[in-house]
Every structure is written in C-alpha cells, then in structure tokens.
Amino acid sequence: FKSPKGETVHALKDLNFTIKKGELLTVLGPSGCGKTTLLNIAAGFIRPTSGTITLGNNEINGPGVDRGMVFQQGALFEWLTVNENVNFGLRMKKESPDVSTNKVEEWLEIVGLKGFGNTPTYQLSGGMQQRVALARCLINDPDLILMDEPLGALDALTREKMQSLVLKIWKETGKTIILITHSVEE
C-alpha cells in the first residue's frame, strides 16, 4: 500500500487465502507484522500495492456497507448516547425511526446493555464501550465483520466476557468474522 508520504510499503507478501461464508478467522501475530494492514485492505481503507481482495464476486476498492468494523478502541461518538451511537449507521441509511428504534433495543439487549440507551458513551467502561461498538457494527447487518484487536484494551475478566459474547453472536448470526489479535488466549 502507499503511505501518507506516497512511499510503497510492503507489509504483506505472497498472501493468498479464502474464508468461507460463516467462518471465524483469527489472525494472530506480533505487533508490526501486517495484521491491521490486512484488515484495512479488507475494509477498503487502503488499497493493496498489487493483487486483489474480493468479497463474494466483488473486488474491494473502498469502504462499503457489506463490511463492518470494530476497532481496538471503541471509536464511538462520545457526545452521543448509546442509542444514538448504535443507530448511527441506520440513520445514515435513512431507516425509518420505528424500525431503527426496535433494532437498537434488540441489539442492546443482545450485547447486554439494555437500560443504557440514554447514557452518554463517555460514561461507560471500556468493556461497555466495546459492546456499543459491536452493536453499532452488527445492527447494519454486514456480510463481513472485521475486528481489529477489539479485546486488547480490556481487563482479563471483561475480555473473557467479550470473547464469549463474540462467539455467541457468531454462532447465532452465522456472520463471517476476521478477528485480529496478538494474544494467543484470544
């Protein structure tokens, strides 16, 4: 890919793999080995220097609604409430308020945040913020979920709960997930 200075960066080389629909792929490696670069290419945030990446039969050339991203840090809009953060993508798609309200409530219950909808996200713990980020991703029903070390900043107990939640959601939804981590335990 090209760096902000226009220099070519070879973070990945001779990489070729296929992920079947409904699989959960964990990419494990030390810091700096290209894990996040792989995810950023899959998300369409950066273009590969050579080669292609496809989702279904479509080449990925930029961000798209068919992919959802959960970052290491929640990347939430701190000035918005939990409901407003989770509903953000639906609002951008101009989903009807009645439908979006029901979907938000459903996903907040799934991620264990029922009753926190009107809470500003800056008042939440790190684990709760990650659950908001997960709900915000999943409510848009992406074909592919990209998770960039989403558990890395959490304490051990919260990390274990989030691991269980991610596995439960994966099993129940059948979504395809790529999870990036540097932790063998994850």
Where do the protein language model's features map onto the residues?
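The feature captures the beta-strand-to-loop junction immediately N-terminal to the Walker
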Residues: L28-P30
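Helix-to-loop junction immediately C-terminal to a conserved catalytic motif
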Residues: A43
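Conserved ABC transporter NBD signature motif
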Residues: G51-P63
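Short coil-to-helix segment of the ABC ATPase nucleotide-binding domain corresponding to the Q-loop/switch region
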Residues: L80-N87
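Conserved ABC ATPase "signature" region
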Residues: N87, D98-F116, L167-K168
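Conserved signature/switch motifs of ABC ATPase nucleotide-binding domains
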Residues: T119-Y122, N140
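Hydrophobic anchor residue at the start of the ABC signature
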Residues: L134
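Catalytic Walker B motif of ABC-type/P-loop ATPase nucleotide-binding domains
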Residues: I145-D148
